[in-house]
C-alpha cells in the first residue's frame, strides 16, 4: 500500500489578483533623459540608478515597466507622469 499526501493550497481570489497592475512608460521624441529620470525619482520613488536604467530601457526598447502595485496606488502616480509630459499607462 502506498500513501499519497494530498496538499491543497488555498489562495484567495483577492491575493491572486492584488498586484497585477503596472505602469508602463513609453519612449517619445520630446522628453530628455534628465526629465524622465527626474520625474521617475520624484513620482515613482526610484533611486537615481533605477531611474537611469529605466530611462535607457525606455529609449532602447520603446517602453519599460516602472512600477508594479495595486491599481489604486498606481493611478495617482500615472496621472503625475502624464502631467509631466511622459507617455504612460496602467496595464
Give the positions of each predicted feature.
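Terminal domain-initiation and capping elements
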Residues: 1-91
